[in-house]
Amino acid sequence: MQKTGGSTYIISLPKQWADKVGITTGMRVGIRPQPDGNLLISPNISERTPKRLVIDVTDLEGDSLEREIIAAYLAGNDVIELNSPKILADRKKVIRSVCYKLVGTEIVEETSKRVVIQNLLNQSDISVKKTTQRMFLIAGSMFRDSVKALRTSDFDLASDVEQRDDEVDRLFLVISRQFRSVVCGSGFVNESDISVDEYHDLRMAATPIERIADHAQKIARLILSKKPRYDDTTLRIIEEMSRKAERISRESVDALFSSESGPANKAIEEHADLIRMISDFSNTFRPESVDDPISLRVIVDSIGRVADYSVNIAEIAINASVAGRN
């Protein structure tokens, strides 16, 4: 460490590292301060070449084609080129559908033999905190509205809940891509108030949030397909269970973003009470007394699963809180 002038410090980069990453005299490097006080140095940040992947899709179709494109996106590729002697219409339909699921992607070139997908999103514009919070807001509203649709037999609302799951999936994939980019060293943690460890915690929490949305969608789909109707007493019990599950999820997420273990421990305690309530209901209700008892069991099970996934978030929050004290 050397000091020049009144406020400038100079450090030397290790030659072995500079040679390995190809840094030469006159090149620019990116330097970004991290919340823990460290400096993150990235070579050639201003000269980054777009990452490109070429995929032969001749033997890919349907779900396998979709999985291949999503995997390429998550791997951080900026350009995904799909080639085949002839790309049939059904494959192009799958490709367009996948592009809708991936935030920032556009088809920039399309012929009978080639489709080029480009990610136009600047990853420095993404806030993992805001993205995770938005995921939870959507998932929470989906769960709340799915139970409301059951009470009111509002099939339009149930259909809307089903469609909202796509947005949660889109946000989940963005977070996954960003996290992998940071871990692999090809991206920065852009927020000044978040460390790589916190980034990891939010990525971990995004999975149970996505599962909460899945169970809300499951209830909505059941309403649309089975159109179950239950008496007022049964509906009140379902609503009480769902309110408890929603409160547990809200407390868990609040604990995650506040880095406090108190709300998380409270959520875990309330989860135990809800599980007992669900168990008592399942053991006492008579299938012959309700319309479509199978659907009722599925709904109650999904409510319990929402609470279970919320506890997963609470446990992540507790771990993060303890780690932050070191």
Task: Identify the role of each PLM range.
Residues 1, 6-8, 12-326:
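Cytosolic, long alpha-helical scaffolding segments
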